[in-house]
């Protein structure tokens, strides 16, 4: 099963908006995953958010760069940033996203240039 967690052991049920950037050389890139009203920010959750864990059959990709965005003083969004510094990290992330998209019936839309 392919899943994303903010608290290890608790799968996030909200589907994120994913934004990708890539350097001209193709060797570096970033992925920003934005979750609106995620389970991890629910009132019944008492555990601490320790990172963003992207888990699939190959293993786990981890990012510690997670921020909450607030609306009217209440947590509304979680934003995870994953920085890819090599072509291998980019390819690994893309394999994760392919698997995640397939399991969650998601599509891919290329940005307009």
Curated annotation (Swiss-Prot):
Part of the photosystem II complex. GO terms for biological process: photosynthesis. Belongs to the Psb28 family. One of its GO terms (cellular component) is photosystem II oxygen evolving complex. The keyword Membrane applies. Pfam families: Psb28. Gene3D superfamilies: Photosystem II Psb28. Disulfide bonds: none annotated. It comes from Trichodesmium erythraeum (strain IMS101). It is found in: Cellular thylakoid membrane. It is a peripheral membrane protein. InterPro entries: Psb28_c1_sf, PSII_Psb28_class-1. Keywords: Membrane, Photosynthesis, Photosystem II, Thylakoid. This is Photosystem II reaction center Psb28 protein.
